[in-house]
Amino acid sequence: MSEETGEGASGGPRGGPVLVTGGSGFLGVHCVLRLLEAGHRVRTTVRTPAREETVREMLRTAGAEPGDALDVVVADLTSDEGWAAAAKDCAYVLHVASPYPPTVPRHEDELIVPARDGTLRVLRAARDAGVRRTVLTSSFASISYGHAERERTYTERDWSNLDGPHLSAYAKSKTLAERAAWDFVEREGDGLELSVINPVGVLGPVFGPDYSTSITLVQRLLDRDLPGVPRLSFCFADVRDLADLHLRAMTDPAARGERFLGSSGGPMWVADVAHVLRDRLGPPAARVPTRRIPDALIRLASRMDATLRGFVPDLGLVRGANADKARDVLGWRPRPPEEAIVATAESLLRLGLVKSAASQYT
């Protein structure tokens, strides 16, 4: 047994449960599932008592019946209540929870304050409970936004420019929350270790109606909510691989004090995603649009659509993510983005979450 990782030869855990914040979220529930599969006891937080059944139902959809191996507790990022009890006796914390509004917030502080202050609440509770290491889920948005270059590949050495133009409230919230986390551990951590994962767009199997914005892209393509595809590009990673990356960062001594970009390949245009759906899914994706919408039309439509307005500065922009560090240091081996796209679509269809194509899928 490694004294540094606390893992036995079989990969099983030693000591108390692992705390996962935000267990009802898309990435959070996949982290819970991966930990359970590895033999860990898991404690996860939800915002309200009613969300416990949501977590367990999603795990049942994934084929898991954790029973007593999973403890669900109530703790909200906007309140101190519940966090000390949540972190008690835990050796590790995966802080996955983060506010993400369904619509553009009226003021950026609606996102920034709970993201930053919530992260600090979790870290204080972890420190006070004697947690060995916290793995923070940050974002590619804390690395690659606010820069002047129209085409650039980013690494963990980069940070988003908070003084740059067109910086969204979400990008600010993730950048400020991550910087606050590093500052806290350096100044007040009292031995608490920190590792950070910076995922790109998250795709992969969904277990219920709570999922990432990237999943919504696939859903809207299948539903033909858009008459064509905007000139936007994204990097993607499969949620299962990102859960695996969190576990690797949790126990590997080399992950201490490090950031890791989580991306499975280079940037893909939305048109590329549409073609993957058409080529790999057959009839359910036969009507997925592939014609590009002119930038001028997107700009015109954005005057009446706040969500669309947020994408206008990114038209034609290519942000690459170099994930060599996760591969080289942690031995991470993500699946190709095309597999993540197909798994996303198949799960949406299977759960009846695609309006126009669900009846065609068997």
Each language-model region and where it sits:
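NAD(P)H-binding glycine-rich loop region in Rossmannoid oxidoreductase-like domains
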Residues: 49-50, 60-117
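N-terminal Rossmann NAD(P)H-binding glycine-rich loop of SDR-like oxidoreductase domains
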Residues: 16-40, 45
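A conserved pocket-lining segment of Rossmann-fold NAD(P)-dependent short-chain dehydrogenase/reductase
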Residues: 104-105, 161-167, 202, 209, ...
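Conserved Rossmann-fold NAD(P)-dependent oxidoreductase catalytic core, especially the SDR/UDP-sugar
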Residues: 95, 99, 103-170
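Active-site Tyr-X1-5-Lys
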Residues: 165-194
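Glycine/proline-rich active-site loop of Rossmann-fold NAD(P)-dependent oxidoreductases
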Residues: 188-192, 204-217, 249-260, 284
